[in-house]
Amino acid sequence: SLNFAAMARQSERQSSTVMVPKGQEQPESPRIHTLGASELRQPAKRISKVNESVRELAREMLRSMYSAQGIGLAAPQVGVHQQLLVIDLDPEEAANPPLVLINPEVVATSGELDTYEEGCLSIPGVYLNVVRPSQVDIKYRDELGRPLRRKADGLMARCILHEMDHLNGVLFVDR
């Protein structure tokens, strides 16, 4: 739900299993819930089976995220209490598909902290400095259900941690 409009411009990119054209012009997509909606405060449940309905939810979330010019979105933001995140830091780069994270778990974070301004598609127009670890190591399943690990730093680490907060009913304004 990080909202960096300058980073999210119109373009198209495809993933092998979660194919969604990029840009603001999207077909009907789920509404993003905003601050005050009880859905944003409920913890999400683990996804027990990765199947086509999970992939379709990821596609719908990507459409909503691209429409809103965001770079990340969590399922609770569209009213679905499942542990699913979509992230696309560079919507203009067709060579890199969006990242789909199912049941993400933090394995480790760096001791080093960074402060950076964040925004959220669920809290439009509000930007605040948030302190987060500069690096994160996570484990998750991808859209095919494969177990994966990923180390991230910089903006990717921040985006992953921001979106994972949504899975626990935490918003960046709580930080």
Region annotations inferred by a language model:
Residues 2-175:
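Positively charged
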